[in-house]
């Protein structure tokens, strides 16, 4: 299972996973967009190995419903959870808020994934350790992988916008205060759009 396959790392991870023999569950806000983007680089045969499930990670109720659907359909098949989806809006003047009132990048990039992992962890742990990839049976330990990109990379959007956003988790006061308005950042300080936490 991989979140965020409409562009970048997530989209470019589909082909190697499928080529290695994996069947993939792709989680995105829009199945239509995810399918359209995947169709540009994958054959119909490859697309048939992807199950698209629509979940908006910023909405924790949708995450719960989506995790239930995943657990029902793929309980014994879930081997890897790749947390890749993210939002990054460095030009915002004030924070966007999720349905539950959390700062949106915190909701998508962290809280939604955290909840998804917690809801699916038992399925991962209890899945069969023997898998068949490209005709070979191998032993496999289920795993969770969390991806992130460096926003200071000048080749990426974040690196082209001169917004100082040094890493600063402080004492994690944002967690203590629940990220509800006016708190947006993990450190509990004033909103900085160039930070994804």
Go through the PLM ranges and name each one.
Residues 1-197:
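Rossmann-fold NAD(P)H-dependent dehydrogenase/reductase core
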């Amino acid at each position: 299972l991989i979140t965020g396959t409409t562009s970048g790392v997530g989209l470019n991870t589909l082909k190697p996973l499928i080529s290695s023999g994996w069947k993939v569950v792709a989680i995105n806000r829009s199945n239509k967009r995810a399918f359209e983007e995947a169709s540009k680089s994958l054959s119909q045969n490859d697309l048939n190995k992807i199950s698209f499930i629509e979940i908006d990670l910023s909405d924790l109720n949708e995450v719960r419903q989506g995790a239930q659907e995943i657990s029902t359909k793929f309980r014994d098949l879930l081997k890897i959870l790749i947390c890749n989806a993210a939002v990054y809006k460095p030009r915002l003047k004030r924070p966007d808020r999720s349905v539950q009132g959390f700062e949106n990048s915190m909701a998508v990039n962290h809280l939604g994934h955290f909840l998804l992992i917690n809801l699916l962890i038992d399925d991962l742990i209890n899945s069969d350790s023997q898998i068949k990839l490209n005709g070979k049976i191998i032993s496999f330990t289920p795993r969770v992988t969390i991806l992130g990109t460096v926003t200071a990379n000048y080749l990426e959007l974040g690196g082209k916008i001169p917004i100082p956003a040094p890493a600063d988790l402080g004492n994690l006061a944002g967690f203590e205060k629940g990220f509800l308005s006016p708190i947006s950042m993990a450190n509990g300080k004033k909103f900085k759009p160039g930070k994804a936490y």
